[in-house]
Amino acid sequence: MDVCARLALWLLWGLLLHHGQSLSQSHSEKATGSGANSEESTAAEFCRIDKPLCHSEDEKLSFDAVRSIHKLMDDDANGDVDVEESDEFLREDLNYHDPTVKHSTFHGEDKLISVEDLWKAWKSSEVYNWTVDEVVQWLITYVELPQYEETFRKLQLSGHAMPRLAVTNTTMTGTVLKMTDRSHRQKLQLKALDTVLFGPPLLTRHNHLKDFMLVVSIVIGVGGCWFAYIQNRYSKEHMKKMMKDLEGLHRAEQSLHDLQERLHKAQEEHRTVEVEKVHLEKKLRDEINLAKQEAQRLKELREGTENERSRQKYAEEELEQVREALRKAEKELESHSSWYAPEALQKWLQLTHEVEVQYYNIKKQNAEKQLLVAKEGAEKIKKKRNTLFGTFHVAHSSSLDDVDHKILTAKQALSEVTAALRERLHRWQQIEILCGFQIVNNPGIHSLVAALNIDPSWMGSTRPNPAHFIMTDDVDDMDEEIVSPLSMQSPSLQSSVRQRLTEPQHGLGSQRDLTHSDSESSLHMSDRQRLAPKPPQMIRAADEALSAMTSNGSHRLIEGAHPGSLVEKLPDSPALAKKALLALNHGLDKAHSLMELSSPALPSGSPHLDSSRSHSPSPPDPDTPSPAGDSRALQASRNTRIPHLAGKKAAAEEDNGSIGEETDSSPGRKKFPLKIFKKPLKK
């Protein structure tokens, strides 16, 4: 049974095997026949489309691949690929989300693409003419499969073989290219299909010139950004510096304004001092008038009384007043023995000062204009900075340097104006001290031109003084003290200034009273300056006469103090000799009165008395006060024996000391000037 079963199985297996072989042989014959038919149809179609290349086997394989691609895209198998079929193929098979660009590249103006159109498009493509090196470069850069480079070079695959890579061909990819990885085969197919249909990829179309231009553009952009950053920082620093300079100009302007206010205040105080001096001189003149009235009263009492003792007492008092007047005259002559500047020189110096002030004001106005220009430039830059591109525009323009230059120029001009103001004040103060009269305070340039008889056309047009002032920050460091010019004079000049400020008929004091004659009024000022007095000799001669009168009586006066010997001791100056003779004559007149009281028997025509009277002018009328009487009245005002006059004199001296003129009877004691501004103590 077993053997039979086995034999049956063997027979059955043999029958089945024979039947299978026969079936497979029939199928292979059919396939071979169909393949042969398809190959024949493909060759015929290829020869119809491109007859010159129909005998090339490689071109036939490429055409067959292109035909397979067209068949893959032609869903309805009508022989043409329309717009919808290509769009669907791009979206589904190639996975393009936005196939608009690819779609327009594939179709162009032809909406239906046939196999012939697709083959002609492939032949006209740049990829068709690629060499082996270009295909290898495409494989490395675009497909990113550099491990198959050697295989491609061995097979010498050029651009003509690109369609065979775009279709699914296991023999080509697996056997020929030896790609075992399925993902690599699929990736190569898709990239090749895209290249065949739409041309070379964009990555392979770049040129090095564009890359170089891109790099250069990036470098230029980075450099421009860095340059803009540097310029922005520089402009900010420059703006800070300019704003600092502008603030310095503001401080300088404020400092100059403060200095000008101090100067105006000093001038006002100086005018106040002058007014006080005028009031003081008026008060002194009133005291002199009271002293004259007192002397006149004493004289009337002496003349009107019949009591000899009263008359002798009054005469002694008058002699004491004469002695005191001579002493005061000595001091006044010593104080007036210095040089006096001519009065015309004061007007010329005042005119010179006003002309210099005009030029200073012109220079100061120019400095103010420069400051205003600098301020306007700074304001413009501030406004530009507030705009969108203001900082960049300011950084690349020359306005910053121009404004900086204007600020520095204005600052230098203000420094020059400050130095000129400082030097001018100091110089005119020294000139006022040396000359002994006022120059800065004057009636004005028009009054001076009229007083000096100058043609006004020579002076030109005057400029008004500006209302405000500017100054550099150097004024903050100015340590000079503004001192009243007349308060800095020497002791001899103070008395001369006081004499000039008084009225002509009262300002000369006892000197004019003692020298009241026609010949004295005709003397020129230069004669008085040239002839120096000798007060010690005059006082010494007068003292001898007075001592002789008071000690030995009238006879010893006639014998010991002869007028001839006294005249020999008088000074050489004619003017001062006249002064001394007038004072001495008055003393002799009083001695004669004593002689008449003490010795009535003495004849009035004594030769000694006549000789003494021959050296003096004729006595004045009783109703008219004589010059000697005026001298006695002037000196009696300063005599402390009158109580109420002494109190007024002390008050006047205190007022005089309060304005800075410290008077002292001793000519050797130094008089200190009044400082209107005191230097502030630095903390």
UniProtKB/Swiss-Prot annotation:
Residues 473-481 are annotated as: Contributes to fast Ca(2+)-dependent inactivation of CRAC channels. A motif (Microtubule tip localization signal) lies at residues 640-643. The modification Phosphoserine is found at residues 255, 510, 517, 519, 521-522, 565, 573, 606, 616, 626, 658, 666. The chain crosses the membrane at residues 212-232. Residues 670-683 are annotated as: Required for generation of inwardly rectifying CRAC currents. Residues 130-198 form the SAM domain. The microtubule tip localization signal (MtLS) motif; mediates interaction with MAPRE1 and targeting to the growing microtubule plus ends. This is Stromal interaction molecule 1. It comes from Bos taurus (Bovine). The gene is STIM1.
